[in-house]
Regions:
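Iron-sulfur cluster-binding electron-transfer modules in prokaryotic oxidoreductases
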Residues: 1-155
């Protein structure tokens, strides 16, 4: 990414990049928050791996660990959890029809999992998943992984 920038920006980006970390990775890898036991709550939740978290940042296990922290949820894996939902960056704007097909496939996998909630760590994916589920009148909720984790904290 930074190779496409003018040198004056490239140096700043390369200096900042190692200091940036996803909140899921921060909580699990740096602050060492982890589930004490596998949660087996009543509400089934599945996890969608966003492209930027899994491919660019290597974040995959950490969001699942945070979901498992909430005893109200039971994490169930969907097929192709790591497959793009069709909303990466400006892709949905430049390839709208293909984006819809990809989103529909992701929606089908969410429904097939039997989950009542689909979690992801990406706001763009949240919008795409919400749109695909709403188009089909599906009752599945879309939540950010940190929202599910926050629900488990004492109030």
């Amino acid at each position: 990414f930074s190779n496409n920038l003018p040198p004056r920006y490239r140096d700043a980006i390369n200096a900042l990049a190692p200091k940036a970390i996803d909140i899921n990775a921060l909580l699990v890898d740096v602050l060492h928050i982890s589930p004490k036991a596998q949660a087996k709550g009543q509400t089934k939740v599945t996890y969608h791996e966003s492209c930027h978290l899994q491919k660019s940042l290597g974040v995959s296990r950490q969001p699942r660990d945070l979901i498992r922290m909430n005893p109200e949820y039971n994490l169930v894996e969907m097929a192709e959890a790591n497959r793009c939902c069709g909303c990466g960056g400006s892709f949905t704007l430049t390839h709208y029809d293909l984006s819809l097909k990809m989103g529909q496939r992701k929606r089908d996998n969410v429904i097939a999992s039997g989950a009542e909630v689909v979690a992801t760590g990406c706001p763009a994916c949240m919008m795409q998943l919400s749109d695909m589920l709403a188009r089909n009148n599906d009752p599945v909720q879309v939540k950010h992984t940190i929202e599910i984790y926050a629900e488990s904290l004492p109030r």
